[in-house]
Amino acid sequence: MKRVKLTAIIQKEGRGFVALCPELDIASQGTSKKQARGNLQEAVEGFFETASAAEIKTRLGTERYIENLEVRLA
């Protein structure tokens, strides 16, 4: 089975956490960071189990760049 490394961006939002996989544009949430990550992993695995080969190729083939920005605060 082929494996691919993807990005998980997890941030606190209100009383919970939101997790995003930007490569696939899939998000999930949870009450803890660990739960949000686990839920995201389940969502991503579900996507790969159900999506067509064309949809997978389209999402993984899109160029995305994650970079840090430094801005001045007023």
Which residues does each PLM region occupy?
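Short aromatic-glycine-(Arg/Gly/Cys) micro-motifs in beta-strand/loop hairpins
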Residues: 4-21
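A short, exposed loop/beta-hairpin motif centered on an aromatic-Gly-Thr core
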Residues: 24-33
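Compositionally biased, intrinsically disordered low-complexity regions
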Residues: 16-18, 32, 63
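Short, charged, surface-exposed hinge/linker loops at domain edges
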Residues: 1-5, 9, 34, 38-74
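Intrinsically disordered, low-complexity segments enriched in small/polar residues
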Residues: 12-14, 28, 59
